[in-house]
Amino acid sequence: MTIERIKDGESSLGGRPLFSSVVDVFREQAEKPPGGDSSIASCYRAVGSLIESDADFASFLRSSYEERPNMTPSHFVNLFFRGIQYIKMYGHDFDYVSYGDAFDWEPELKRLTTENRKQLQEILLTKDTATTVYQRYAGPKALVAALTNGRELKIADLGCGANYGLRGFELNEPFEQIENGFADPLNVWLERPLNLSEGLAVDKVNPEDPEVKYWIMACSFYPKELANVENVKQMEERLKQSKKVRFLQEDLISPTNIISGGYFDAVILSTMLYQHHPEDRLVILEEARRIVNPSGLIIVQDFAKKDFSEKSGLRFENAWFNNFGYRTFLSTGDQSDRFFEVFKWADGRCHQVRPGQDYPLVMSKAA
């Protein structure tokens, strides 16, 4: 079988997980797909089958993974599906939304990795996932509103994707209903306008580029959610009224220090660290610590949990299904080496929340 030949031929990649780890992630997520999406599940089952039966398909995936030295297996798996979805959406082909069986996907994956091989390989070698869901900013918005008592704020959003977050804060764009059994104040904080004097949204690609817009769209929706695209486009039109948020195009893995140190009252990193190599996460977190002021807030929202054995203080996981593994963490400028767990979300769509381990401690300081 192809997978046996792959494993037999593998050697160490300088401490990086081998391609067999990518295969494992495909199989794990075929059983527990992101968002519980049946189209993604059947796609990943088809990938597992083709890796076993089609040497050319397996070789294509393996070589693409091994040419991205800082890419984690989970990021590669996510990127693969987003690349497939991008190609399908760009061609206005949405039949895959209803695919519920690996047999539906197998001929399509073979076709795409043959006819669209160059395009798909370029995606796998050069792009990063850029999921942008405004609802994911509910945790950061609630934290900032609760802890800043209406004072004037300068906020940075590192890895902003489509730049929804800060513009939504400025315009007080409402969030969808959140089910919570513990904190009525959550809705009060979400409805409270922030006194945003200046916002800086940072990403390595410009969200106003038409091709980037298509890519963000492909990354931001599960197939079963594509019916919501029109609502998001309407929100984007509303966000164009923003006047206080500017965009900076910069690769956070290689920061240029163009941003002044200690300048911001809050820095947000929403769902972007999980896809990076551990050493790159440290670089990004160090930049966040550099630009926040000593009394400022660093807010990380991601698929992670506290782990003091990790250099970052957080262990990142593939908790994309409903197990409350998507969490909101707080660090401060004067205690930047420590994270407090504030909120635990049922999943990355943020419609159900529980108090985090450190919620009482953090919110004892709420205004």
Could you tell me what each predicted segment is?
Residues M1-E66:
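Non-catalytic accessory regions outside enzyme or core folds
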Residues F60-E152, Y164-E173:
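Class I SAM-dependent methyltransferase Rossmann-like catalytic core
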Residues E66-T72, D93, T114, A146, ...:
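Class I S-adenosyl-L-methionine-dependent methyltransferase module
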Residues E152, Y263-F264:
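Local beta-strand N-terminus motif with an aromatic residue
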Residues Y164, K213-M217, A227-I259, I299-A367:
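Class I (Rossmann-like) S-adenosyl-L-methionine-dependent methyltransferase catalytic domain
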Residues P223, I253, L273-H277:
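Short acidic, S/G/P-rich loop/turn micro-motifs used as interaction or catalytic elements
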Residues D265-E279:
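A short SAM/SAH-binding and catalytic strip from SAM-dependent methyltransferases
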Residues R281-L297:
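A short glycine-rich, Lys/Arg-flanked "PGG" loop and its adjoining helix->strand segment in the class I
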